[in-house]
Amino acid sequence: MPDLLIELRSEEIPARMQRKAAGDLKKLVTDALVEAGLTYEGAREYWTPRRLTLDIRGLNARSADMREERKGPRIDANDKAIEGFLRAAGLSSISEAHVHNDPKKGDFYVAHIVRRGREAEEIVADVMPAIIRDFPWPKSMRSGAASAIPGSLRWVRPLQSIVCTFGAEHDETKVIPFEVDGIVASNITYGHRFHAPEAIAVRRFADYAEKLGKAKVVIDAERRKEIISADAHNIAFANGLELVEDEGLLEEVAGLVEWPKVLMGSFEESYLAIPSEIIRLTIKTNQKCFVTRKPGAETLSNRFILVSNIEAKDGGKEIVHGNGKVVRARLSDAAHFWKRDQGDLPDLETLAASAGKFGLDLKKPLDQRMAKLDALNVTFHAKLGTQGERVARIRSLAAALAKITGADPASVARAAVLAKADLRTEAVGEFPELQGIMGHKYAVLQGESAAVANAIEDHYKPQGPSDHVPTDPVSVSVALADKLDTLVGFWAIDERPTGSKDPYALRRAALGVIRLILEGRARLPLLPCFDVALASLKLQRPAMAADVSGDLLAFFHDRLKVYLRDLGARHDLIDAVLAPDADDLLMIARRVEALTAFITAEEGRNLLAGTKRATQILAAEEKKGTEVAASVDEELFRLDAERLLYASIKVASDGARAAIAKEDFRSAMEALSKLREPVDAFFNDVLVNDEDKAIRANRLALLGLIRSATGEVADFSKISG
């Protein structure tokens, strides 16, 4: 079967857009082909800085004929109805229609319509111009003389050529001709911009990839990443060093080169006095270079690794020299930031009021930056006040949390006040991703305790599902306060995540709270925390506080479900223990854990079956309005199975309640498991719907006791199986 090759070659595409753009091309083209009636065996996308490529294998040469039956009016319908049917069906005469009989509706006309298939070349030529014109680039531009013409092509960078060939594996391929803004599809591409700029005639993908490889273009981005990684590790090893891995940078650099050549540069060792994080970010952000270190060392070496797109005749000496000059200049700036951040700010007398508000020591650089942050009234959010106001809220909430975490109150207060101070440092101004990290370093330099310094860095954590979770009580208190203030604040102003939109990363903040609580085994009722946070916000409409708390707790429940499911918990078991007002997340998780162990055991499965049977019978009778006794009357028992079940429920309920009071949910489940045999015996020996109304009502009340007993730990009706 034929293969289709498409290449869209342009000037340099931003690295961050390449992977998605290639995926978009694949989806748009394959969707259009399938919609037009073509099928294919496989498709794969490729990309380089200058081209998007699509290789489709086993594409049908022609779409199949389509047959359709279109129902028309009855044969005795008026002329107007018949004429409308003929027009809609594309028939020239009613004699071309068929007559079908329906026993109920009588005879009616049916048109048998055949839509002839189309050649694949025709379909491709038909769909490609619109795909290119409407391509979903996040940013695009017009170029050339046609750019002034309304409706002219927009592309991420000027589009230069289009390749579109089609043909079976052992046959000659054809060019599928179509045109977009004067660019005509052909079988001609071009190699590396500098090493092989000549035209190259290609047929199908294998031929295309081979010829581009000879023209110093590695078409496969994953292969470019492998080359860069292997060569970088090798050159580092050869110099007695190891590469500091950076997957994000590797992805970006692979999108900057078509023919990767790995080189090593260096800078003066004196710059190693700058924190490693600043060195790494300076070199990464400005020069897209990797850093190295001695094997097993924490600190960096003065060697960096760069990736060139050119195979230089001098072995890359000039490239290394040029990059080294820029790296040194950037590190010189970084050293300046680092030094200035440790010095005094000017006009300290203007910061006295802010210093007094937060108990700051203006002899210390980090305290000065916090005072400056407050004095400048830097906005956190238009509806949530300034950064200074936010720090005051975090301090208040962290103080309340310290009573629960057992953290030292003075350390918590100090860490909360300094947590955002590094936002006014020059290092964080240059590299925002260093917030917290630089605060920790400056805190250590000015003599803060380890607990305070660590909390300044760790209060942003965890920032994702795999990030480190702080365990020190001071860090946990400030981290929880920071995230809860954010969540309560944005809920209070009705800025909540919707669908895929979460501009303030509130889902991540909620996950952070969940991980801090569960992984730290913290008993932290959320609703009182919401109350403290809401009180600090000074809402204009206090009545809305209850709505905010309820909605936010429901949001936490949703995120907790996702988190527990990711850990392997069953969704129905989570639902079974999750009451609407449950705000102790650790207790919810422990109940799910205990219920999971119980339900997977034979006793649990059998009790579940019996409990669900009891619940279903009771629910059905309640729905019909059947009388259910308010309480069980032992005098109405007629069978030993009734007496045994009643006595067993009392013992199991007492045992379960006592275990729950001790927060021993496994023992609570074990207590309930003793109901299995009495429940089985009851349903084997007892007819619930007895003819005597009083006995029936009493037996239904007994079923209600089963439901109530198991309901102490979970709503068994929500458990599947």
From Swiss-Prot:
Its main location: cytoplasm. GO terms for biological process: arginyl-tRNA aminoacylation; glycyl-tRNA aminoacylation. It is found in: Cytoplasm. Its EC number is 6.1.1.14. It is an enzyme of class 6 (ligase). GO terms for cellular component: cytosol. Tetramer of two alpha and two beta subunits. This is Glycine--tRNA ligase beta subunit. It comes from Sinorhizobium medicae (strain WSM419). The lineage of its organism: Bacteria, Pseudomonadati, Pseudomonadota, Alphaproteobacteria, Hyphomicrobiales.
